[in-house]
Amino acid sequence: MASSLKIWGTLLALLCILCTLLVQSKEVSWREFMKQHYLSPSREFREYKCDVLMRENEALKDKSSHMFIYISWYKIEHICTSDNWMDRFRNAYVWVQNPLKVLKCHQENSKNSYTESRSFNYIEFHCSMDGYVDSIEDLKMVEPIGN
């Protein structure tokens, strides 16, 4: 009897550790996506500059081009939520219903500065197995945004 309790206790402890690792993996991919692509609406869209964004983010320093999206944190968090609100899309591609503001940065030949293009785009996001956005898959530009 005591040995079976030890086995069940060990299995329960291992299950708890596994669950913790799964939660942390979701947080890492979600956090990385937000760190690399998110522009907060707390500032005006025109205030964001590619040279500053690409220089400040360590993960983007060696990239020749990158894309940022200007959307509320709440909306990004709920992109992978189905109509049921209790369910999340898992390992699925989801197009947003309304166009979003996008800032694209392209490195120029001098490698010290970036050109910027701003536009409204429909965006297709990938929802991870955890049910949270982990990447941008496709864009359809609606119209450019003038400076």
From Swiss-Prot:
Residues 1-25 form the signal peptide. Gene3D superfamilies: Ribonuclease A-like domain. Epididymis. Keywords: Secreted, Signal. It is found in: Secreted. The keyword Iron-sulfur does not apply. GO terms for cellular component: extracellular region. InterPro entries: EDDM3A/EDDM3B (IPR042402), RNaseA-like_dom_sf (IPR036816), RNaseA_domain (IPR023412). Possible function in sperm maturation. This is Epididymal secretory protein E3-beta.
